[in-house]
Amino acid sequence: MNNSADPTGQNNPANTTNPTDATLSTGGERPVLRFERVLAKPPEAVWRAITDREELRAWFPCEVIADAWEPGARISFPFPGTDMTLTGVVLEAEAPRVLAYTWGEETLRFHLTPEPGGRTRLVFTDETPPDIAARNAAGWQICLGHLAGESIATDAWKGHFDRYTAAFEPALGPQQGPPAGS
């Protein structure tokens, strides 16, 4: 059975106000968050933004230190100002189309498709533990907004988290808030 939670009704054809919200699929082993955005850059530029250490600093929630962007390569993700470091492994890398890697307990996937006008359709998924799905959806919404060059209010995370919590708890149970020390 595949259940999906849609916190804004974006799958309702009448709602076109915010196509950047996450959808949640619960039909597999783990919940999967899915975001889809059209970015105003060609795939090669988006690929650099998701693989270049300096460009990642502009939008990713922590440092990203990769041995290489090829299957099997190791990645570390130190969080500035904390003693927390996640580790990961590159699962798939086909420049400039697909990048997938583990991020701690999660699997992140970026799928890039060229769009007319030199733009790129990004489909981002996060295979996440169920109890942090709302937290992750709120965080990725902000991070992907930064990747798209959007101006994000400093207090936006809380509103996103509250909305996703209300949408996801019926399917996934209680949701954890921000990590300790955040």
Model region roles, listed by residue range:
Residues 2-26, 118-121, 126-182:
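Terminal "cap-and-tail" regions of soluble proteins that handle hydrophobic small molecules
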Residues 34-35, 41, 45, 51-87, ...:
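Short beta-edge strand/loop motif at the mouth of beta-sheet-based domains
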Residues 65-71, 76-131:
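Hydrophobic-ligand binding "helix-grip"
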